[in-house]
C-alpha cells in the first residue's frame, strides 16, 4: 500500500508539473530566449559597411520590447489555463494562444532578418517594414487573446486557484506597461523612420494602427 501510495504521489506530481508548464509554453519561451541570446552575441557591424540609421535602430529595439512583453503574457496565460479544471474553456484558449505563438514566431523571424541585414549594411525598406507589420499582427492577435480573457475571467475564477489568478493579473499589468512604453518609444521615432519604411511601398497606417492598438485604454487588464 505504501509503495502504491508513493507511486500515485509521483504520478500526481508529474501531472501537476506538466499542467503548469506545457510543451507549447516551453517552445515559445525557448524561441524567445534563443533570439535574445543571438542578439546579445551579435558583433558590431564592420566599419566598412553602411551604418543603420539610429532612428531605425531605436524603433526596432522598441519592437523587441513588445516581443518580450507579449511572450510574458503568453507564458502567464498558458500557465493559468493549464491549471484550470474547465477543459472546454482551456480548449478555446489553446486555439487562440496557438495563433498568438505563431505570430510571435513570425516577429522573431522578421527581427532575425533585420539583425542579419544590419551586419551587411543598412537594411532595405522591405526588411524594416516586415518588422513593423509582424509587430502589428502580434499585437492585434494578443489583443484578441486579452479580450477573450476579459470575457471568460469570471468563469476561469471558478476553475483556477486564486493564487494563479492574482499572479496572472500582476503579470498582465506589468506587461501592458512594457507594451505602452515600447509603443511610445516607437511613436517617437515614427516620423524619422517613415522614409525608410515607405521607400518601396507605403505600409498602410502601420504606425497609427500599432499606436492605437497598444495604447488603447480600453484594453481589458
Model-derived features: where do they sit?
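Signature of small four-pass
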Residues: 97, 103-120
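Long, low-complexity intrinsically disordered regions
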Residues: 1-95, 99-102, 122-221
Amino acid at each position: 500500500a505504501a509503495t502504491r501510495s508513493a507511486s500515485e504521489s509521483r504520478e500526481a506530481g508529474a501531472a501537476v508539473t506538466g499542467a503548469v508548464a506545457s510543451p507549447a509554453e516551453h517552445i515559445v519561451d525557448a524561441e524567445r530566449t534563443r533570439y535574445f541570446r543571438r542578439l546579445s552575441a551579435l558583433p558590431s557591424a564592420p566599419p566598412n559597411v553602411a551604418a543603420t540609421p539610429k532612428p531605425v535602430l531605436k524603433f526596432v529595439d522598441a519592437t523587441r520590447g513588445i516581443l518580450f512583453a507579449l511572450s510574458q503574457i503568453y507564458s502567464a496565460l498558458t500557465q493559468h489555463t493549464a491549471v484550470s479544471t474547465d477543459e472546454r474553456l482551456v480548449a478555446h484558449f489553446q486555439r487562440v494562444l496557438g495563433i498568438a505563438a505563431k505570430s510571435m514566431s513570425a516577429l522573431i523571424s522578421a527581427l532575425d532578418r533585420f539583425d542579419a541585414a544590419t551586419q551587411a549594411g543598412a537594411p532595405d525598406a522591405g526588411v524594416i517594414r516586415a518588422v513593423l507589420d509582424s509587430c502589428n499582427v502580434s499585437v492585434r492577435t494578443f489583443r484578441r487573446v486579452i479580450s477573450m480573457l476579459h470575457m471568460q475571467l469570471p468563469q476561469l475564477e471558478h476553475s483556477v486557484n486564486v493564487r494563479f489568478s492574482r499572479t496572472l493579473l500582476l503579470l498582465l499589468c506589468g506587461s501592458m506597461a512594457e507594451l505602452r512604453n515600447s509603443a511610445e518609444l516607437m511613436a517617437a521615432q515614427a516620423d524619422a523612420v517613415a522614409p525608410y519604411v515607405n521607400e518601396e511601398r507605403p505600409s498602410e497606417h502601420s504606425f497609427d494602427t500599432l499606436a492605437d492598438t497598444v495604447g488603447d485604454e480600453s484594453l481589458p487588464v
